[in-house]
Structure formats: structure tokens, C-alpha cells
């Protein structure tokens, strides 16, 4: 197998860990990070380009003749970075924009689970603050209130306090036009990552 030049898109600890692993691989000749961080500068070549400038990311990958692009953050994936790279025949580890919407939109994810019969908590979309009391009656506390945006882990409130729940609902409806109210499911939480290609996983 020929050695690869790899571009890691992102600037967080996740991307730093990926860059370390790639730098240690005998199959990788060079690692580039965009934009990277202070830590990645010791093991890779950082490129001061915004990861939200998708065309600039693609242009850099072409210029460097990158063998593989690994995308960490969700936002550029939702915006279609993997699609743009594949359009240029540049291999990319990351879902297309449609697949990334499972992470990018909580409502889309709930609708997909509902359509496919995948068990998930009961939910309701709330668009009018006049229905807040109906929600309090329909869902038992603690109430799970979610924004339908990528919010860096800040888009969810779980509370048994009616004033706190009302405040979150009112402010997020004002921002986004609606919120998602979800049944609270108690228990352990686990994340499972599955890597797959056209032939399986």
C-alpha cells in the first residue's frame, strides 16, 4: 500500500487525537490539519483556513494532492463538505450532507427513527408558547427541551422546574420558531460508532 497524505479538518481534541494516530501510521507520509491547533502543529502542518469555507478546503486538498480527508466537526459535514470532496474524486472519511443531518437536526433524526420503526422517546414539536401548559400536562417531568440546531451540546435543557422549562421554551421559540419536547428516558447512555462502506460494516 502506498503512503498517504492525509488532511484532518477541525481544531479540537478529537482532531488532535486523530492526527496523532495518523502521524504514527506507517501508511501515512504526511498529516495536514485545517485549521488545527497549537498541539497539532508539533505533529502536522497546520493551515490557517476556516473549515466553514468549503471551497477553500477542497482547493487545499487538491493543491496538496491529499489522499484522504478526515472531517471531525459536524457543521462542515452538514454543509456538504464530504459531497464537495467526493465530487472532485477526493476520498473523505465522513458522511454526506444527508447522512450528517441525523446529527445536524434532532427533528430529522426523530422523524427517521419514527419512519423506520426504531424505538425512541415520544416527542412533540411546539411552535406556540400558548401551548406550554398543555406540554406540561402531556409530558411528565423532568421535561426534555431541545433546539433543532447544532449548538455544541448547549441546545438541550432537562429540568423539573416549570419556570426554567418555560424560560427555555419561550427563548428558543423566539430564536428558532419551534422547540422539540421529548419524553425523558432514564438510564445509562451509550454512544456506538459504526464504520461502514458500500459492502457492509
Regions found by a protein language model. Give the residues of each.
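ATP-binding N-terminal substructure of ATP-dependent carboxylate-amine bond-forming enzymes
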Residues: 1-98
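General beta-strand structural signal in soluble alpha/beta enzymes
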Residues: 8, 33-34, 70-71, 92-95, ...
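Short acidic-hydrophobic, aromatic-tinged amphipathic segments that line or gate anion-handling sites
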Residues: 46-52, 124-128, 159
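Short, hinge-like loop/turn segments at secondary-structure boundaries
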Residues: 47-51, 87-89, 110-112, 139-140, ...
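Short acidic loop-to-helix transition motifs that present clustered carboxylates
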Residues: 53, 126-131, 164, 186-188
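Conserved ATP-binding module of the ATP-grasp superfamily
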Residues: 68, 119-121, 142-145, 158-191, ...
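A conserved helix-loop-beta module that forms one wall/lid of the active-site cleft
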Residues: 95-155
Amino acid at each position: 500500500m502506498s503512503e498517504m497524505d492525509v488532511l484532518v479538518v477541525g481544531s479540537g481534541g478529537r482532531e488532535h487525537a486523530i492526527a496523532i494516530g495518523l502521524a504514527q501510521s506507517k501508511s501515512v507520509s504526511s498529516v495536514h490539519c485545517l485549521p488545527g491547533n497549537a498541539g497539532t502543529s508539533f505533529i502536522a502542518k497546520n493551515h490557517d483556513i476556516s473549515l466553514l469555507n468549503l471551497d477553500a478546503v477542497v482547493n487545499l486538498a487538491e493543491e496538496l494532492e491529499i489522499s484522504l480527508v478526515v472531517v471531525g466537526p459536524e457543521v462542515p459535514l452538514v454543509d456538504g463538505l464530504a459531497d464537495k470532496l467526493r465530487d472532485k474524486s477526493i476520498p473523505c472519511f465522513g458522511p454526506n450532507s444527508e447522512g450528517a443531518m441525523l446529527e445536524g437536526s434532532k427533528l430529522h433524526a426523530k422523524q427517521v427513527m419514527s419512519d423506520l420503526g426504531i424505538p425512541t422517546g415520544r416527542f412533540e414539536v411546539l411552535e406556540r408558547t400558548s401551548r406550554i401548559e398543555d406540554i406540561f400536562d402531556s409530558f411528565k417531568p423532568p421535561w426534555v427541551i431541545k433546539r433543532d440546531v447544532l449548538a455544541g451540546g448547549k441546545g438541550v435543557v432537562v429540568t423539573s422546574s416549570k419556570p426554567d422549562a418555560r424560560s427555555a421554551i419561550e427563548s428558543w421559540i423566539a430564536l428558532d420558531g419551534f422547540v422539540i419536547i421529548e419524553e425523558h428516558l432514564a438510564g445509562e447512555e451509550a454512544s456506538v460508532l459504526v464504520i461502514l462502506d458500500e459492502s457492509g460494516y
